[in-house]
A protein has these predicted regions:
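Conserved SGNH/GDSL esterase-like catalytic core that processes O-acyl groups on lipids
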Residues: 2-101
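Alpha-helical cap/lid subdomain in secreted, periplasmic
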Residues: 42-45, 63-201
Length: 201
């Protein structure tokens, strides 16, 4: 495996004492790290939130090991899954094939509904109004590949790329992340979708 200069993973469980509430597991990267606490606050007394976030791309053996560890301790009622903003040295075919294998692993390991959340736009550093010409192209290619995988597997998709695309005022200057308003918008978007999904479960 090719590695990024810094690899990282985070696991966080909110409201572990609330056994009476359904639990949502967010799987993603630093975008999840940004909006998960806001989502947990919005959903307080309605659902508990947990997240596993990592810099690893699907297909990295460490990704699956760490994901299974993250999911081992507590049952979850709904999974919101994303991967795609890391591992840019791997092509779209690698991403597609390993995303499909990871999805199949989640489906066989956890008997709960799974939703897919696509990846958010990447802008040019210090120019939030401009999409990054190379990296955002990779994001759109991966989002298309992921959409095909999810459609075939009948996994619903939540389009956060479109939500964030026309709002440079929500972007941080690093090109990847979002300011507090952007995180709030993302959390509100997911809260509505995920509560509805739980109600239909």
């Amino acid at each position: 495996m090719f590695r990024e200069k810094t690899e990282w993973s985070q696991l966080y469980w909110f409201n572990t004492d609330r056994k009476d509430l359904p639990r949502i597991m967010l799987i993603g990267d630093s975008i999840v790290v940004g909006h998960a606490p806001v989502l947990a606050e919005i959903l307080a007394n309605k659902a508990s939130v947990a997240f596993f976030a990592t810099s690893r791309i699907v297909g990295d053996p460490a990704y699956t090991r760490e994901l299974m560890t993250a999911m081992a301790d507590m049952p979850v009622d709904l999974i919101e899954f994303n991967n795609g903003l890391h591992g840019f040295h791997y092509d779209t075919e690698f991403y597609r094939n390993n995303l499909q294998m990871t999805l199949e692993h989640l489906q066989t390991s956890f008997r709960c509904p799974i939703r897919w959340r696509n990846s958010t736009p990447i802008s040019t550093p210090d120019e939030p109004e401009k999409l990054h010409p190379e990296r955002n192209l990779i994001v759109t290619e991966r989002n298309l590949a992921a959409a095909e995988v999810m459609k075939k597997a009948r996994v619903p998709e939540d389009d956060m790329y479109r939500l964030m695309l026309s709002h440079p005022e929500w972007r941080s200057m690093d090109g990847y992340h979002y300011n507090d308003e952007g995180k709030k918008v993302q959390a509100e978007f997911l809260a509505e979708i995920l509560l509805k999904a739980l109600a239909e479960k």
